[in-house]
């Protein structure tokens, strides 16, 4: 008995650290002519396995619905079908959708209604912005940080740190699919989430619900995409280069579109319709930067030369060469996400999600403009492995269990081995 109580306490305390990843749909269905409630009317979310029926009062409720835009269909024998298009489900929110059905003597008649997004959310108790995947696609940005800086109350410092309402970067809580994802070392996000992978982005500032127990100034809650019953794919790319005639910026006169590019692709669809779906994506990004130094000397004080032995030492008859320009603020990165959703039984959903990313970069150092070889390189690696299990107990309650492992590794060095002989001047 004591063991059971301990497990229950752990689950209750653990729930405080979980962010919302699903929404709720509810409403009342009546006969348009008589105003009487419709008992047993079917409510179906099209192209999904979600559905329910109305009770004796014409009321219905559906829980645990992933956030996105849906078409909701009301149908009942003896009435025209009523299809509501553009219904938006939001994480941690209740979407109210009522319906008035018209009696029909011809089977198959249908009425289509286009829903509109409410300008005011009456159940919101804090300052928040909710950005859907459709809105993200229309923004001229490629990083989550660029989306955040467009929101009210959010500022970005020179190092890229996110501040909300004047607080510190470590006071912002990041969550991915309801799981805390903040890096305990610097307060940033532990893994890189690409905009293409986000189904819904919530930016909350001010007061918070109890589920965000560790947040002080703000919460960034990201819900990643799931696969559906139809195959979908996308490819996004851009390429370019920095150009300037200002002599302050060296070596920006020649155009080379391979110096700055990004390629991302995604594919989703069914493995077994209505039972198993997948979502997979990847991105490669590179930039040689816009700040260049004239590489003139080696780390040992020699004039640059052809390092035929690749040891950075001037050996034997190796020939000296003219100084050359080299990037001082470059970066190169890749990331991938793979997610599989299982629906083995009605009301039971399993989700397995993996996110991997790696980044190499150098930061600009004014003192090393002529000695770029002495500049250290930064290495970032992030990994997220998550398992989510949810089960709907009744129209008004469900259970959810999240198990995850998150790793974030940051290193910065000139040579990987601290005992490397090249750290010593020959």
Q: At which residue positions do the language-model features occur?
A:
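Transmembrane beta-barrel wall of Gram-negative outer-membrane proteins
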Residues: 256-360, 380-397
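Periplasm-facing N-terminal accessory domains of Gram-negative outer-membrane beta-barrel systems
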Residues: 19-110, 114
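Flexible, surface-exposed loop regions and adjacent strand-edge segments
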Residues: 128, 132, 251-254, 294-310, ...
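Transmembrane beta-barrel strands of outer-membrane/channel proteins
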Residues: 115, 235-241, 280-286, 352-356, ...
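Short strand-turn segments of transmembrane beta-barrel domains in outer membranes
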Residues: 200-207, 218-221, 228-269, 282, ...
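Periplasmic N-terminal accessory/gating domains of Gram-negative outer-membrane beta-barrel systems
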Residues: 80, 85-96, 110-210, 214-219, ...
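Structural signature of outer-membrane beta-barrel domains
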Residues: 80, 118-120, 169, 181, ...
